């Protein structure tokens, strides 16, 4: 009788373990399924940098809205491929003044372009002064502000205010004509 009770108890325990293992396997399958990235974006939010210093001056800054991201384009009168972009405080070039108090947005991208915003005679090539807003971003889903931080010793700085810390990418495009562009895209969400 004792053996029969022990075997019955063992059978109940084993049945419970087998049932639990089946549920765990099903739960594991459910947990392994992840949502696909927003618009296929896999950029991340880590710092990005590339290229070398150039003497081709910055001549234009413009923005654009796309379905999955907002864009800032920096155009140069010649070949430029140097930049460093990352989240954090941005300082004016040559003065060291923090731009965060003057830049709208929940997060701040510091953009350092490895090219001047002045020509060979040291005359400014963009219409902005240090601290001025370079774009009207009304109705942009992600971008909140683009503030010129100045140009000093061949480097030009911008503070780009965004809604939150979001994935971004930076790349270089040739043209039009002999110009080049550094492009910054910031996703609308993760």
Where do the PLM segments sit?
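Short linear recognition/processing motifs and adjacent strand/loop elements at protein termini
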Residues: 27-190
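Secretory targeting and sorting signals
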Residues: 1-28
């Amino acid at each position: 009788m004792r053996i029969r009770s022990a075997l019955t108890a063992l059978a109940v325990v084993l049945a419970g373990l087998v049932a639990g293992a089946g549920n765990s396997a099903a739960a594991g399958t459910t947990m392994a399924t992840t949502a696909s990235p927003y618009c296929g974006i896999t950029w991340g939010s880590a710092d990005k940098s590339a290229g070398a210093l150039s003497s081709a001056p910055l001549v234009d800054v413009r923005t654009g809205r796309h379905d999955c991201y907002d864009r800032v384009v920096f155009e140069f009168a010649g070949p430029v491929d140097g930049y460093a972009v990352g989240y954090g405080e941005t300082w004016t070039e040559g003065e060291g003044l923090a731009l965060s108090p003057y830049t709208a947005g929940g997060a701040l991208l510091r953009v350092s372009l490895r090219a001047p915003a002045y020509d060979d005679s040291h005359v400014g090539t963009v219409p902005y002064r240090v601290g001025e807003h370079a774009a009207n971003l009304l109705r942009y889903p992600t971008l909140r502000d683009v503030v010129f931080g100045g140009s000093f010793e061949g480097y030009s700085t911008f503070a780009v205010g965004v809604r939150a810390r979001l994935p971004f990418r930076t790349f270089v495009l040739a043209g039009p004509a002999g110009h080049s562009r550094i492009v910054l895209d910031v996703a609308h969400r993760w």
